[in-house]
């Protein structure tokens, strides 16, 4: 393996991995299947809202149920596409580039022309009207993506850490003309679901949306001497909070049974 993303395992990362691992065990013991659909709606709403989609959770629910929604056509299409993309989780291999392209084609169907293929022009990560990261030149993208996937296939790193590192490196490369954020978050969920399937039903994206400014700040401050360490710490914190929130939701649902 020739490429290794730069990052450092800090005490904060170690503690968060231990905390999440313990919480996952408890979550399995008390898993509430009735919350799966609600969580999928929260996931779709969160991952799209991060990038400006204005549909409410109620409208996302209506789209899921096939009901008419009064909203911009492209935003409704984004919801339909994201629902289809997350339904592919069981069929995608997190270590295959072709599956990444398939997921992107699903996520961006009917929205842009360049679906399921790497970008041909420049790109960057934008927060509001501010460009916080200029991506590598387009001609480098296939090689950078292949290096990243080779690292993912061969790394011995804990899946919690590996998924966060992949997420950051993916956003750094920004391989597509559009839909990089949505696809990157989907792929982290995919990686985590191969470690613990319950991650398919955890609305991590909804908590990322809650801390949207911090999410983009973590991307912006990563890449220096510490590599993507700040981003890894941030996302692990989001996962830990997601599990805490889910436990509270589970207890409340039991009260109302």
Predicted stretch roles:
Residues 1-255:
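FIC/Doc superfamily catalytic core
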